[in-house]
């Protein structure tokens, strides 16, 4: 199906399929400026996907479904799900009776899972993440973190990593990827080789890997 559709597209919509737009996952009125802008971008530019941020599970699913309807082609939907679907799907309150609504399963940061030394638990984390994320219409998890946390001065990786041992990171990361991908969701290993040995916060500035090739390969 994908090949047959791709063959019908000109260069511009092909390029647009590589562009994703970010959106909050919270409830948004259909005439709210933020929502109208994103809906128009998707419909007019034929964008390929959306990156969903924080919102309640029902709100995320509702917004994803609405944007899917606005798109000429099915959208890919991704989200940062490093500690499970709860990394983006938060709970809330239903009025007037103030009944607490659940969000999604929240797991420890990966260092907590790595401390168990049990790949089966990492697999189960992936399974639950995929099942809950797919229920909200999310296709791709921007997880797991596969950086090796081997620099105590690193300000941004820390507990997001499985640990400082490359073998452990590989084993636990492989299990988590399998748990995600064997249950209908795509996984994304991140961030890049050596990022666990940098000293910059990559959310704020460009991280630099100031080590030799031999250290990278070790």
Regions found by a protein language model. Name each.
Residues 180, 184-186, 196-197:
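Proline-centered turn/helix-capping motifs that create local helix->coil transitions or kinks
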Residues 1-6, 33-37, 218:
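Alpha-helical scaffolding within the catalytic cores
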Residues 24-172, 191, 196-212:
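Enzymes and membrane/adaptor proteins characterized by extended Gly/Ser/Thr/Asp/Glu-rich
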Residues 1-26:
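Mature N-terminal segment immediately following signal peptide/propeptide cleavage
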